[in-house]
Regions:
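N-terminal pro-sequences and low-complexity stem/linker regions of secreted or lumenal proteins
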Residues: 22, 33-36, 63-339
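Ser/Thr-rich, Pro/Gly/Ala-heavy low-complexity intrinsically disordered linkers and tails
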Residues: 16-67
Length: 339
């Protein structure tokens, strides 16, 4: 006897989950992206890494991009004292320009507007210069250390493994000058929550340990500052060889990062300069910001949107699923460079 197959329609119920969050009491929260691009992927409610902070489903960029474009490892390399025109298209920087052609370039990226070096480094991790500039005091000289939330504070609170690598630092957490090392190029040293604790020696180390840490894949945020010979800072007199020096260093060290599993598995490398040269005939504040990632939107991608060192901090926070500091709450995010 033939068996009859009886079919019926079963309705499918779709549930829309909307998670909302407001600013937290410490001045951090989840901002809206002024670029209007953070929610374009339509995945702001995804299960990204930012869920633990309570912002993964928010309408702002720290939730949307933190979930949909979250980077597993973020690398940051900061060079010294060259404006945009001194690097982009320069014959003195062939390797760096090859990176620009293959990855992404922010063509309207600015330093903090406060000089010399130190205020720019501090802005990159705290969203503010922290003092009026005009000099580069040591980490233990007034008005430092300062008590202010910063990226190090956030990474520790979120239990995200990280380190700051300083070429030629020698002794970990070194607070004094030692040619060719300068503590003013390690901004994490200038905050009370780092300088006065055992974290200082654990997190601020000589660049010599970077290769082993990179191979181990332990850390999700890795800040790198080349020494005073390699960072591109021009000598006081001609010939000005800084761009050649930084390009030579980059040509040796950056390929090691690009060959690593940490980079290949969703990594993002930000290569930038602390401040513009400021000499006659040069831009006062415009500097290169090169975004390098296997997930770059397209080879040679460029954006003329107005970005700055504050945007860098906001972007790192978004990619790692961290709530934004109040100092960068309304800053645009550079996640448009990523797929």
């Amino acid at each position: 006897m033939a068996r009859r197959l009886v079919c019926s329609l079963v309705p499918v119920v779709t549930t829309l989950i909307i998670a909302c969050s407001g600013s937290s009491s410490d001045g951090t929260g989840s901002p809206a992206d002024p670029n209007g691009s953070s929610g374009s992927s339509g995945t702001s409610g995804s299960s990204g890494t930012s869920g633990s902070s309570g912002t993964s489903g928010s309408s702002g960029s720290s939730g949307g991009d933190g979930g949909s474009k979250g980077a597993i490892t973020i690398f940051t390399i900061v060079m010294e004292n060259h404006d945009y025109a001194e690097i982009v298209g320069s014959p003195d920087a062939p390797y760096i320009n090859s990176l620009i052609a293959s990855y992404g370039l922010a063509t309207n990226y600015m330093d903090s507007g406060v000089h010399p070096s130190l205020p720019n480094y501090l802005t990159m991790i705290s969203g503010a210069p922290q003092f009026g500039g005009g000099s580069d005091p040591l980490p233990q000289a007034a008005p430092f250390p300062v008590t202010q939330q910063n990226l190090g504070t956030q990474l520790e609170a979120a239990k995200i493994p990280w380190k700051s690598y300083q070429e030629s630092m020698g002794t970990a957490c070194k607070l004094s000058n030692g040619t060719p090392y300068a503590p003013k190029h390690d901004p994490f040293l200038y905050f009370t929550d780092m300088q006065a604790t055992a974290l200082c020696a654990a997190k601020n180390v000589d660049y010599g340990s970077f290769a082993a840490d990179l191979a181990a894949g332990t850390y999700r945020y890795m800040w790198i500052t080349p020494n005073l010979t390699s960072d591109g800072h021009d000598p006081q007199t001609a010939p000005l060889t800084g761009a050649k020096n930084s390009d030579a260093w980059a040509a040796i060290e950056i390929p090691k990062i690009l060959a690593s599993t940490a980079y290949k598995n969703g990594g993002v490398l930000f290569l930038t300069w602390d401040e513009a040269e400021g000499r006659a005939g040069h831009s006062k504040d415009q500097i290169p910001m090169i975004v390098i990632s296997p997930n770059i939107k397209s080879p040679g991608f460029t954006s003329g949107k107005p970005y700055s060192h504050k945007s860098y901090l906001a972007t790192v926070e978004d990619l790692l699923g961290l709530p934004r500091l109040a100092t960068v709450m309304s800053e645009p995010t550079m996640t448009e460079f990523l797929k």
